[in-house]
């Protein structure tokens, strides 16, 4: 896999290097004079704002690689860097598509990750969103408060998921707005 192929192709089409770097799609993390594809060898998820506009990306690694001699492991998920358009703390994955269904039933299913939301959507659950990791934030809570009265937390059953469920309940109970269930 050539991690510079996309950059080289866009550069050949006269895209501005500065804009390419600001896009978050590329990184110079490896200390080279050339930009590398940040999401190489990953499944890419477009991250859309509430209006449905793609503002960032997240990539899930396809194959876990063993640690190199520095002990470095690649992260399972890698997001675009935060920008004026994208702040992970303010963001709920799939909110743009789920909002009308959430409002119609005044209920939201809160999942841990993208794959959970996608699987639920394929099974007919159209009111699902993901908190982009294992922690619901106050900012995400404010978004949900404006949209639903009932929240069903469907985080993973592993230890991090259980701890995240406890933290989410603490945040959700502070505003006394939600009827909270755990799935």
Question: Regions from the language model: what does each represent?
Answer:
Residues 165-175:
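Conserved acidic, small-residue-rich alpha-beta core segments centered on
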Residues 177-183:
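C-terminal or mid-to-C-terminal helical accessory/interaction module adjacent to the motor/catalytic core
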Residues 152-159, 178:
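Short, polar/flexible loop-turn hinges at active-site or ligand-entry regions and domain interfaces
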Residues 1, 36, 156-158:
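Conserved short loop/turn motifs at secondary-structure junctions
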Residues 3-151, 164-165:
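Phosphate-handling DNA/RNA-contact segment within nucleic-acid enzymes
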